[in-house]
């Protein structure tokens, strides 16, 4: 019973630390609300949406789509940019593009939006939740390296989960609240364990790593 009480207290403390870290990361200004789980449209966005509706331009060929893609390329310095209906569909397409299929496992951070897990399920893969760190709220790569070293082996060039016997084919990180993951450690992990990488940067637009 004492052991159970200890673990409950420990988990509660961890949960409180996570919440505290999130609140600090938001860095709210006085009287400024930061919307997280509800839509928020300012006057400019409402005006642009009204223009689209009035001009009957609300499809993939809408006149703002190309402008949006060009601005994304400019901001991110990416060679290509393709707009999708939402972030979930973008993750789904990314998994298909790198050849993820049924029975593959995808590593995703435990603190996450449901889109990551859903995208894995759409292609028949299994989301494999991994630890995060309090500093960035992203993947704890130190713990991940220890975990993979202990619980996986290589077979036919793939990192194989010893317990499930399924190949771990990729890692899908998320830059939570705009805090970039430690990409230096990420590169070491994907190289050592032969993983493909997808970055969910929906919350990281405008953030840069070093």
Residues of each region from the PLM?
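Conserved PLP-binding active-site segment in aminotransferase class I/II-type PLP enzymes
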Residues: 2-97, 101, 169, 173, ...
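Short, flexible helix-adjacent loops and helix caps
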Residues: 58-61, 153, 210
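Structural motif
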Residues: 76, 209-210
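PLP-dependent aminotransferase-like
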Residues: 96, 100-192, 196-208
């Amino acid at each position: 019973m004492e052991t159970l009480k200890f673990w409950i207290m420990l988990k509660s403390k961890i949960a409180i630390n996570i919440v505290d870290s999130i609140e600090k990361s938001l860095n709210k200004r006085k009287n400024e609300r930061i919307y997280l789980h509800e839509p928020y449209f300012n006057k400019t966005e409402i005006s642009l949406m009204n223009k689209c509706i009035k001009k009957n331009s609300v499809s993939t060929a809408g006149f703002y789509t190309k402008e949006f893609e060009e601005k994304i390329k400019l901001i991110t310095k990416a060679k290509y940019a393709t707009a999708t209906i939402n972030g979930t569909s973008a993750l789904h397409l990314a998994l298909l593009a790198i050849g993820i299929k049924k029975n593959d496992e995808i590593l995703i951070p435990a603190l996450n939006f449901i889109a990551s897990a859903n995208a894995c399920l759409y292609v028949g893969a299994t989301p494999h939740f991994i630890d995060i760190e309090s500093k960035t709220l992203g993947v704890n790569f130190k713990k991940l390296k220890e975990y993979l070293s202990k619980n996986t082996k290589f077979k036919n060039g793939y990192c194989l989960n010893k317990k499930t016997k399924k190949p771990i084919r990729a890692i899908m990180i998320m830059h939570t609240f705009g805090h970039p993951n430690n990409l230096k450690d990420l590169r070491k992990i994907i190289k050592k364990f032969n993983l493909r990488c997808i970055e969910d940067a929906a919350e990281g637009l405008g953030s840069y790593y070093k």
